[in-house]
């Protein structure tokens, strides 16, 4: 679809990153952090064009003087004014489109409060005057992107991790499980264990540095105990990282202790099953006849599934839980960081999807609750 005139806009509002672009494209045009930053200091230079708030990459680049806030926490919008700023930035600065001319596809995590999607709907129609909109479930879109209609998706982003079993295109709502343990919690945990090494990171700007360390150096150990022993015995696992001021820090067992939290949430004091057990529990809530297909089509998606070694570890853990004869296949597509967006792009450009949009007219007749009737 090369004419962006009628192309739908696809906006995947993650807790950590916002991915936006046009339906029919194979990748998002704009990917920026879901951050709104406000200055901590008073402006003294007149005519500098200082703003009272910055969004996305601009906030990231000026983070030294800003307080950074993420308006989406655990997949739920906690600050609607900031959220509106992010959408405004998405449409007018990143995509450079008029939202009143394009249908908009938004995404959200399953088991979100109903009020969350109602408010999303309201803002799209009333603030941005969109002609039509739709709210899709993130994991379902990831499955579309992998070209399957059956499988279980483990989608782990910055704010929320969830497992959604889908059979022949139908999500099985009773078996959807959600875990509020994701990338941001891992970043916080890494900040904590780096403090034990004598590196103190406290401000919102420094948290972004730790996030970068996490994304560049962390990996998932196949055998945690053995890896800990290796790390204690030699310095082969140590890596160094250069901070923005030129100081170099060394990190060792923190590299795999951080992502290990996904498998052992007790590390951060959470009383819940790890991602492997959550996936298994989700499969066990499904009908006995379809479990075989789910085990063989376990799809990873989201940025927190990007750790090297995580697919092998999942394979090992689920094999240990499942019946011994079961064929288990973990699918980790290389583009899984963006698979929710890619699935949205596919969905919004299907001819059969066109009657699914909630139109402005329907919204005017029924109000925000229309979203529960028309979106899964």
Swiss-Prot record:
Keywords: Acetylation, ATP-binding, Cytoplasm, Cytoskeleton, Hydrolase, Nucleotide-binding. GO terms for molecular function: ATP binding; hydrolase activity. It is an enzyme of class 3 (hydrolase). CDD domains: ASKHA_NBD_actin (cd10224). Gene3D superfamilies: 3.30.420.40, Actin, Chain A, domain 4. Its EC number is 3.6.4.-. Its main location: cytoplasm. GO terms for cellular component: cytoplasm; cytoskeleton. Residues 1-2 form a propeptide. InterPro entries: Actin, Actin/actin-like_CS, Actin_CS, ATPase_NBD. Pfam families: Actin (PF00022). It catalyses: ATP + H2O = ADP + phosphate + H(+). It is found in: Cytoplasm; Cytoplasm, Cytoskeleton. The modification N-acetylaspartate is found at residue 3. PROSITE patterns: ACTINS_1 (PS00406), ACTINS_2 (PS00432), ACTINS_ACT_LIKE (PS01132). Actins are highly conserved proteins that are involved in various types of cell motility and are ubiquitously expressed in all eukaryotic cells. Belongs to the actin family. This is Actin, cytoskeletal. It comes from Heliocidaris erythrogramma. The lineage of its organism: Eukaryota, Metazoa, Echinodermata, Eleutherozoa, Echinozoa.
């Amino acid at each position: 679809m090369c004419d962006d005139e009628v192309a739908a806009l696809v906006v995947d509002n993650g807790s950590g990153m916002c991915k936006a672009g046009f339906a029919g494209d194979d990748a998002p045009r704009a990917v920026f952090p879901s951050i709104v930053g406000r200055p901590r200091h008073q402006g003294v230079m007149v005519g500098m064009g200082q703003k009272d708030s910055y969004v996305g990459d601009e906030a990231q680049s000026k983070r030294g003087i800003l307080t950074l806030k993420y308006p989406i926490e655990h997949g739920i919008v906690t600050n609607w004014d900031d959220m509106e700023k992010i959408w405004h930035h998405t449409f007018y600065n990143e995509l450079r489109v008029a939202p009143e001319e394009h249908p908009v596809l938004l995404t959200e995590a399953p088991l979100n409060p109903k009020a969350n999607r109602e408010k999303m709907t309201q803002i799209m129609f009333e603030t941005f005057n969109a002609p039509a909109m739709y709210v899709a479930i993130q994991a379902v879109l990831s499955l579309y992107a992998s070209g399957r209609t059956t499988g279980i998706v483990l989608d782990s982003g910055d704010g929320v991790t969830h497992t959604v079993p889908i059979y022949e295109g139908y999500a099985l709502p009773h078996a959807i499980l959600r875990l509020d343990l994701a990338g941001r919690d891992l970043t916080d945990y890494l900040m904590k264990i780096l403090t034990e090494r004598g590196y103190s990171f406290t401000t919102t700007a420094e948290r972004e540095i730790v996030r970068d360390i996490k994304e560049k150096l962390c990996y998932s150990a196949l055998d945690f105990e053995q890896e800990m022993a290796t790390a204690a015995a030699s310095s082969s696992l140590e890596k160094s990282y250069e901070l923005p001021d030129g100081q170099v820090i060394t990190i060792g067992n923190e590299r795999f202790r951080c992502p290990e939290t996904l498998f052992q949430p007790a590390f951060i004091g959470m009383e819940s099953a790890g991602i492997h057990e959550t996936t298994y529990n989700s499969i066990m809530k499904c009908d006995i006849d379809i479990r075989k297909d789910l085990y063989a089509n376990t799809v990873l998606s989201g940025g927190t599934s990007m750790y090297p070694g995580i697919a092998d570890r999942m394979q090992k853990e689920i094999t240990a839980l499942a019946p011994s004869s079961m064929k288990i296949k973990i699918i980790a597509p290389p583009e899984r960081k963006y698979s929710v967006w890619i699935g949205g792009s596919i969905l919004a450009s299907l001819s059969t999807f066109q009657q699914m949009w909630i139109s402005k007219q329907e919204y005017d007749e029924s109000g925000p609750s229309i979203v529960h009737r028309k979106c899964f």
